[in-house]
Amino acid sequence: DYLIGKDPFRIEDFNQNFLRSVYFRGSVIMSAISAIDIALWDIKGKALGVPVYELLGGKTRDKVRVYASVMHLTEDNQKLAEQYQQLQEMGFTAAKIFCNGPTSSTDGKGEFYSSRIEREVEKVRVCREAVGPDFDFVLEVHRGMTLPEAVAFGRAVEPYRPMILEDPVPPDNVDTMAEVASKVGVPIATGERAIDLREFEVLMARHACQYVRPDVCAVGGITTSKKICALAEAHDVLVIPHNPLGPVSTAACLQICASIPNLGIQELPGFCLNGAEDKMVKEPLRFENGCML
């Protein structure tokens, strides 16, 4: 009821009111605030007859490079390599590799430190050989390693030149993430679980990452996302918007990507590749040569 009859152009005012007045502000509440904020930006852009990125300062680029965020459900490295060759043939220049295998197995071998590290490193090696040097990898660990495992794994994959090591350890302890970042040569990305501007400030101030991953559907919408990007710029940190959701999230992310100077790359969820997302919208987004246009 709060918004009924009010001026939808007062986006910052509403955003501040929601953030300050809500008593319990967890991820569910922040997702609701984010949805309202994205809708308000959409209303304003349509009312003024301009894309949202024009309201955010205008374009800094004409296309946005994306990486394929795909779920690979095979333990066969050869089949895995073939999947990445197929992505390359589709025009992608970057993709995610899941390196968060189980820490346990029926024979107990999965619990061995050396065995686990070797298994995940081999996965990266095989994929690199399959696609060659002109392809970037985002190594997704999903917070699945301990500090010593993350350091060992990060150092072991350095020869294969991954672009990003994402969430190697749980980000709740910022000092642990910062220690990993200080000991490996692969840039760290984190922040997909953060729901507050100040969480990102702590991550960057303690040098826990080289890339931040704000989720426009969780941090407070486009309004807060733009602030996080500006904060990252001040810390010389690049931005990789988190985007595991549907077309509204993708469209909102692209408005941000188009308007910031410190974009790293944009995540594109796997279901976008099979046309599922196109069926949800009147005008599907265009993908060409590794970029969204």
Predicted regions and their residues:
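Glycine-rich, aromatic-flanked loop segments that form ligand/cofactor-binding clefts
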Residues: D37-L73
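Shared catalytic-loop signature of beta/alpha-barrel
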Residues: D13, R155, R161-I164, D172-C291
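Metal- or metallocofactor-binding catalytic centers and their adjacent structured scaffolds
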Residues: D1-L48
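Metal-dependent enolase-superfamily TIM-barrel catalytic cores that perform enediolate-based chemistry
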Residues: K63-V64, A68-K183
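Proline-centered loop/turn at the N-terminus of a beta-strand
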Residues: P51, R65, D136, P187, ...
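Active-site phosphate/pyrophosphate- and oxyanion-stabilizing loops and adjacent acidic/basic residues
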Residues: D42, E54, G58, R125, ...
